[in-house]
């Protein structure tokens, strides 16, 4: 009986310790491209291909009405998994117009799956975070 009680106490201690861990602590290997330049050429090429896909396959009609409202250029970080699926879309700076922000989320998710990581990129990362400023004029441009 004592052995069972000791085992239950040890399991409870492990659960308590796990619940106190930083929730952002993760074993996922992340690459972050917060601008256009990075020492990792594979990461830059992947992010440029991702941006090109968004810009070339997106019609301005998706945001035309919302973009007529006064708004800021949103700064958005998109996390892409190694298989090309979208992990998250996070706004560093909102456009100030909920319809535009929601349209960006729809655009990002509607064009997934993105290209899977190259073998070189896969050796280093499980997830790549790409940050871009979205600008709407006669088209959608990612800077």
Describe each model-derived feature in a short phrase.
Residues 69-75:
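Short, small/polar residue-rich loop motifs at catalytic or cofactor-binding pockets
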